[in-house]
Curated annotation (Swiss-Prot):
PANTHER family linked to this entry: METHIONINE--TRNA LIGASE, METHIONINE--TRNA LIGASE, CYTOPLASMIC
The keyword Phosphoprotein is assigned to this record: no
NCBIfam families: metG (TIGR00398), metG_C_term (TIGR00399), PRK00133.1 (NF001100)
Name the record gives this protein: Methionine--tRNA ligase
Physiological role: Is required not only for elongation of protein synthesis but also for the initiation of all mRNA translation through initiator tRNA(fMet) aminoacylation.
UniProt xrefs under Pfam families: Anticodon_3 (PF19303), tRNA-synt_1g (PF09334), tRNA_bind (PF01588)
Keyword line: Aminoacyl-tRNA synthetase, ATP-binding, Cytoplasm, Ligase, Metal-binding, Nucleotide-binding, Protein biosynthesis, RNA-binding, tRNA-binding, Zinc
Amino acid sequence: MAQVAKKILVTCALPYANGSIHLGHMLEHIQADIWVRFQRMRGNQVHFICADDAHGTPIMLKAQQMGIEPEQMIAEMSQEHQQDFAGFAISYDNYHSTHSDENRELSSLIYGRLKANGYIKNRTISQLYDPEKGMFLPDRFVKGTCPKCKAPEQYGDNCEVCGATYSPTELIDPKSAVSGATPVMRESEHFFFDLPAFSDMLQAWTRSGALQEQVANKMQEWFDSGLQQWDITRDAPYFGFEVPDAPGKYFYVWLDAPIGYMGAFKNLCDKRGDLDFDEFWGKDAKTDLYHFIGKDIVYFHSLFWPAMLEGSNFRKPTNLFVHGYVTVNGAKMSKSRGTFIKAGTYLKYLDADCLRYYYAAKLSSRIDDIDLNLEDFVQRVNADIVNKVVNLASRNAGFINKRFAGQLADQLADPVLYKTFTDAATSIADAYNNRESGKAIREIMALADVANRYVDEQAPWVVAKQEGRDADLHAICSMGINLFRVLMTYLKPVLPSLTERTEAFLNTELTWDSIEQPLLGHSITAFKALFNRIDLDKVNEMVASSKEDMAPATRVTGPLADDPIQETISFDDFAKVDMRIALIQQAEFVEGSDKLLKLTLELGGETRQVFSGLRSAYPDPKALEGRMTVMVANLAPRKMRFGVSEGMVMAAGPGGSDIFLLSPDSGAQPGMQVK
């Protein structure tokens, strides 16, 4: 009995419309596209949509800096984003914007239903206000000194040095990041979504078994700490949708952003005419809805979004597919090192299929970070795609074209071997379906090794020189071409451009269900080079080009310009700080934190435990073990939810991947005082 085709709606997180797409973004869109292409190959009806997230204070302020209207900026950015995704063959059925009539209508509808159902609460709050710009300041637009560790230039919601979270009003010497003015406190009435009212529903959804284990565990932490009402409004000036019947109040960007999934699909329904919006979003919808997102936005998608949908009588997602971050050469993407690579820059130098393959080979269903090691990238693509797969075709096609007029043999040389390849379809399909593309790639490449071994053992180049063995040569090379066809069918979701060239060469469409029947007595076209090797020089040029993009900014700013020297202190104040040399005995990740590393420090007779915000710069903590560093030894111990931190290690840099742990000169010993 044939399997009934599923109806599936797939979304990617909406890229923010104030910047270019980079290779970190592309991980998600490539992962989702591979899954979508596989589902389509299996006969399922998939609608794949995305949109630009086009609202919020950052977009309003950037447009002001550029001297244009926000509408013009987001329109230009949307065009750039769509061009980048097309360049990577991301097969969207529709790419829209949250700044649309559909999204305005749906945002108002959902808000109205939530309000009517008693889930919207009003209360007056106090907020920091920029008196020069005449605007309330979001947390990330306030900077000051961390109230916990005293690190300067920290954002208003959390410290990137010690990992502490706090409110912007707790910052020491806060300043507006917009004007530099000292903000003042002002009161304003805001509207809140009653998230705690949905706690039981959300916990049941979490325990249903649909979510990834890591996501469910993280959600349980949030439940244990208690859900809070969510502020869903912002005050004018703000670029977004005004709240109905509330002049001067606007929906917070994170309210209308996920509704953008619905708006983009509604726009597709209106374009197509044969799609039913309610079939995919109605309360009792039987279709599947999947969101591919990064781990940084799990909070919004696993709590607020399903609660909003439940409270407004719409269906909840079938599942969230969450992935990790991208690092480059073992470190966070860096503009100064040229590893913050824009999608458009990549496409100027390299084939999109190369990155699609490399990401696919590393992806799994877990929320693990993916490292794009550029040397390994070159070696793996050349070794796998060129040497193993494409070379299989080139080794056999020449004989078929020259000796047999492009006609494949009427019979398979080795039916048992061919069945081994087609039998693998089930396990490879399971891997793709479960988002274990790395597992699928490993199995496909193992088959490629078998295919090349077959050709090596049969040695058609030797057979071709032997009289009376034309039939053997024909059979061997036809077998090689048929094995190549099976491999490329399995790789079709990953390598769309190579697939297109392969289908032209083989003179047939590659479909999952057709591989059981080999190509016998079939005509192929003249072989042309299907794929070019990656040249490491091209990769280096791409990196250099990404550095050049940052050159003007680097010349204009500098450490002192970005981080001015603090006010003068007395020698007596300085003398109170006891800095010591410390040996890092052990460095490890902190479970539940994306920023901290746990360091075990030896001070020459005493061992300390310190939590430090170094993870973004040192993704391999073992690399720190055995290093000497400098620590503040007489800092009062601080209790954190991960344990007690007994001091602070010294580091320089603006933050993110640009944090540099201080090291003493050779000869310094653990426990020595720094004077």
